[in-house]
């Protein structure tokens, strides 16, 4: 890969431009992600266990009826679904990573829990009137483009029973206040991105016109082949969220601040059908 090729990749990026590869379906990276999910001390693929517990306790207070059929979108290896099942919920979990789903299924089997897991893209879900609570945690809602968000909201509305709620968290403007638009590079003999030696060029950008951010990584191997990973996210205000969900006939939108320990850049929302 020549210098001019790198510059071309980084030049004139448009909102929602995609990378060349997906992290979630790469077998090697999937193993690294699972390790990050399961490390209780860090906020990497999942939040640290203190904040997971605080979130679970809050969700537990949002019960809407005695059925409590709950769906976790982007459930990962089951950090939330496992505990919610133990607390008496009828739990289902969808995730795009087969590696995470297989791990979650094994945990449920070992602990004798009846949790329904599926490896799937939640943008294609077709459930109707099945759930009282649908949740989406770790700011996953914000990674979607505008069209994808609208598609997901339609799916969620259809899948919820009357009076059911959608619970999610998102970045807020305080995240942008602390965002450092920057570039960095790393040389590794083998690490997170691949087992063999590589150089990784990383960049963080702010796209104010879409209230979005981009984190991108160009991973270059020993023979100058490369993979480009792009991760978009968005930050929302209460007004943004109201506009999105009221357009799809949701009736009540509530926001909750201060749920996470030492992190005021994330807001939680409860949306009622």
What does each of the following model-derived ranges do?
Residues 2-65:
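Conserved class I S-adenosyl-L-methionine
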Residues 77-87:
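Conserved SAM-binding loop of SAM-dependent methyltransferases across substrates and taxa
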Residues 97-99:
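Conserved SAM/SAH-binding beta-strand->alpha-helix loop
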Residues 111-123:
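Conserved SAM-binding strand-loop segment of SAM-dependent methyltransferases
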Residues 126-134:
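A short acidic, Gly/Pro-enriched loop at the edge of an enzyme's catalytic core
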Residues 150-162:
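A short glycine-rich, Lys/Arg-flanked "PGG" loop and its adjoining helix->strand segment in the class I
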Residues 163-170:
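Conserved beta-strand signature within the Rossmann-like core of class I S-adenosyl-L-methionine
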Residues 170-239:
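SAM-dependent methyltransferase
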